[in-house]
Amino acid sequence: MDKLKISANGPLNGEITVSGAKNAALPLMCAGLLTSGTLRLKNVPMLADVKTTQKLLQGMGARVLTDNISEFEINGGTVNNTCAPYELVRTMRASILVLGPTLARFGEAQVSLPGGCAIGSRPVDQHLKGLEAMGAEIVIEHGYVKAKGKLKGTRVAMDVVTVGGTENLLMAATLAEGTTVLENCAIEPEVVDLAECLVKMGAKISGIGTSTMIVEGVDELQGCEHSVVPDRIEAGTFLCAVAITGGRVVLRNAAPKTMEVVLDKLVEAGAVIEAGDDWIAIDMRQRPKAVDIRTVVHPGFPTDMQAQFMALNAVAEGSCRVVETIFENRFMHVPELNRMGANITTEGNTAFVQGVEQLSGAVVKATDLRASASLVIAGLAARGETVVEQIYHLDRGYENIEKKLGSVGAKIERVSG
């Protein structure tokens, strides 16, 4: 199993190109099931989850072509199987996103209950409740969600804000008979990106980017060409890496307007930030200052950046509190950071961080996707060598992270065994 070996190597300097967002690419790929036409996606990150989604769609009969760099062509005209099996779904929660489009287009779907990162309860009850409100008959048996029925437009008020639930119901509503009103929608940039692509495909959606979307169902959707929105979490991860090591790095193919709260927190930590329409520059010449973090739904501070800022706060001047309100059990990186010399205690959903002057390298284990990113960031500033194990988590969400960081001066290498 691959590992990353990391050693501090001074400030980072240069340019990094940000990949497309995994959390946008996966639902966009699933949207290919809504049409018999061809959906052409650009700026797709070549990640483990993307490849799993490719296999899943191909297993359902869709024709999926890729240049293995950043482009995919998905044709749903050849779909001949409405079942998403456990073997693929178990590794990735986003697999549940085939449920809505498959049911809407074919009138039936079977999807194994999903897997993914072990960061607490992330149930799919809102997905199922919404589809039932639209007329679906749903049973759960033998580990599968089995749904059938012709969907009809209705009012769906989600009990909690859910990104995946919003995406699943939005896709389903595009082909439902009549008008669907989706209330308490997630407004993350990735949801907006999906909605904008669906409109290109012929969907009639109003209220995009707000908590209430109105969808007028159409008889069919067409293919289109769409570029995946840049990954704000990958961009934020690289910015934290520069903030902890010092230096100046420019991120290209970035989307600063999707991550303003993260940029504000970096400024609060002492970084100088400049940004244009599609680039972000960070200049860090001092020890970071501790910053309080409270994760909330977009447009607040994203839970997917909590672990990276925990690493930054670990070596910051002063003390702070980090409050996690989105997921329980999302402090699994804390014991690993403490193994490196951090001074972090937890109480319920709150972590108390007392900054130390320097961390020391250690062998640490990645426990989930963003936790693994925090350990990489910590290793860049630690004295001695850090070895991050179980980096298959990292590969689910970061495209060539060691090459990108290495290109700006980080001492980081992937090793086998």
Swiss-Prot record:
Keyword Iron-sulfur set for record: no
Xref: InterPro entries: Enolpyruvate_Tfrase_dom (IPR001986), Enolpyruvate_Tfrase_sf (IPR036968), MurA_subfamily (IPR050068), RNA3'P_cycl/enolpyr_Trfase_a/b (IPR013792), UDP_GlcNAc_COvinyl_MurA (IPR005750)
UniProt keyword terms in alphabetical order: Cell cycle, Cell division, Cell shape, Cell wall biogenesis/degradation, Cytoplasm, Peptidoglycan synthesis, Pyruvate, Transferase
One annotated Gene Ontology cellular component of this protein: cytoplasm
Cellular location(s): Cytoplasm
Residue ranges the record marks as coiled coil: none
Domain of life per record: Bacteria
EC number: 2.5.1.7
Residues the record marks as active site: 117 (proton donor)
Reaction equations catalysed: phosphoenolpyruvate + UDP-N-acetyl-alpha-D-glucosamine = UDP-N-acetyl-3-O-(1-carboxyvinyl)-alpha-D-glucosamine + phosphate
2-(S-cysteinyl)pyruvic acid O-phosphothioketal modification, residue list: 117
Residue sites binding phosphoenolpyruvate per the record: 22-23
GO process annotations (BP): cell division; cell wall organization; peptidoglycan biosynthetic process; regulation of cell shape; UDP-N-acetylgalactosamine biosynthetic process
Membrane-spanning parts: none
Pathway: Cell wall biogenesis; peptidoglycan biosynthesis
GO MF annotation, one: UDP-N-acetylglucosamine 1-carboxyvinyltransferase activity
Any matching Pfam family: EPSP_synthase
Enzyme class: transferase
Binding of UDP-N-acetyl-alpha-D-glucosamine, residues: 93, 122-126, 304, 326
Listed HAMAP family: MurA
Job description of the protein: Cell wall formation. Adds enolpyruvyl to UDP-N-acetylglucosamine.
Matching PANTHER family: UDP-N-ACETYLGLUCOSAMINE 1-CARBOXYVINYLTRANSFERASE
Membership in a protein family: Belongs to the EPSP synthase family. MurA subfamily.
Protein name per UniProt: UDP-N-acetylglucosamine 1-carboxyvinyltransferase
Organismal lineage: Bacteria, Pseudomonadati, Pseudomonadota, Betaproteobacteria, Neisseriales
